[in-house]
UniProtKB/Swiss-Prot annotation:
Listed InterPro entries: YdjM, YdjM-like
The protein's name in its UniProt record: Inner membrane protein YdjM
Topology within the bilayer: Multi-pass membrane protein
UniProt key word RNA-binding: no
Subcellular location: Cell inner membrane
Taxonomic lineage from the root: Bacteria, Pseudomonadati, Pseudomonadota, Gammaproteobacteria, Enterobacterales
Keywords per UniProt: Cell inner membrane, Cell membrane, Membrane, Transmembrane, Transmembrane helix
The gene coding this protein: ydjM
Organism: Escherichia coli (strain K12)
Amino acid sequence: MTAEGHLLFSIACAVFAKNAELTPVLAQGDWWHIVPSAILTCLLPDIDHPKSFLGQRLKWISKPIARAFGHRGFTHSLLAVFALLATFYLKVPEGWFIPADALQGMVLGYLSHILADMLTPAGVPLLWPCRWRFRLPILVPQKGNQLERFICMALFVWSVWMPHSLPENSAVRWSSQMINTLQIQFHRLIKHQVEY
């Protein structure tokens, strides 16, 4: 997927996550925190490709990561998301206040990139270092891909006008509870590690 596609897809995912109330924090969150945060991180997984939008601007980071992991390796995995969150919680000074909705927006932007790359034939190694590729190849990579734009805009339009009265037993409500539980457990784990 192109940088433009990732930007559009991250905005669409942010709108969907907020309107679907994917987590309680996102449901109550501020649009001006969630959407810019998602945009900020939506290109980050491609830091492993020196010719990517970020790779060209941050060659001093991109080249070593590309040598170590290759393109669509570690940075396109759930382990990378966990590692970045753990690093954030352990290394960011407590005096730095980042709203919870902005942090979830950043995670959402990163995950939107991985999800978008799953729509290409190459897929992504979600369970890296396991080499299995997860894919739903509906996008064929080509410059100026109109299908890419169409899918992003369709998701955006649906997210804006989706029904807000979803049944309590729907998949969205279930996933919201699961994400909230995982977030609480992650916070407890990090807090426990910091105390010892």
